Amino acid sequence: MAVVPIRIVGDPVLHTATTPVTVAADGSLPADLAQLIATMYDTMDAANGVGLAANQIGCSLRLFVYDCAADRAMTARRRGVVINPVLETSEIPETMPDPDTDDEGCLSVPGESFPTGRAKWARVTGLDADGSPVSIEGTGLFARMLQHETGHLDGFLYLDRLIGRYARNAKRAVKSHGWGVPGLSWLPGEDPDPFGH
């Protein structure tokens, strides 16, 4: 099991768009990609996350892993990897997010969560770990995760989507933790679980 540190908001790798994974003419993926995917799964599992983008562990490649239920109350989960994902969503509401149903957290903003407006439905297309085409879609928490992880790969954190008082509260939280600078990380399994799982 290889668990690696998760970068914290302010690290440049989190705020820069990732590079697509190179696919050979025969459709094969780089040989070392399988090890990266295994490390991402191990790290996500140790952190009790529902998703993890490669740049959250310092790798600037366009892929994410997930282990997520359709809704917060459900126990059945979907698990996989998407390489070079392309996101499609329903319309994103223009109203203030509901603090009871739209709360969102992030392993790169450990221990914090803020209401975030997201589309109710999302689909991601890309490649699986074998290089075969994959299309996954969902609503609720699963749709939120798809949008969250592809946002990471585009160089954005969910904090960048916050509006109004939630954006102000997030800025205060980042400042109070001393985040927003390069080089900060936490190690799942060694550092305390910031979300209290």
From Swiss-Prot:
Binds 1 Fe(2+) ion. It catalyses: N-terminal N-formyl-L-methionyl-[peptide] + H2O = N-terminal L-methionyl-[peptide] + formate. The keyword Hydrolase applies. Pfam families: Pep_deformylase. Its EC number is 3.5.1.88. It comes from the Bacteria. Keywords: Hydrolase, Iron, Metal-binding, Protein biosynthesis. The keyword Iron applies. One of its GO terms (molecular function) is metal ion binding. InterPro entries: Peptide_deformylase, Peptide_deformylase_sf. Its cofactor is Fe(2+). The active site is at residue 149. Gene3D superfamilies: Peptide deformylase. Fe cation binds at residues 106, 148, 152. GO terms for biological process: co-translational protein modification; translation. Belongs to the polypeptide deformylase family. Was identified as a high-confidence drug target. Removes the formyl group from the N-terminal Met of newly synthesized proteins. Requires at least a dipeptide for an efficient rate of reaction. N-terminal L-methionine is a prerequisite for activity but the enzyme has broad specificity at other positions. This is Peptide deformylase. The gene is def.
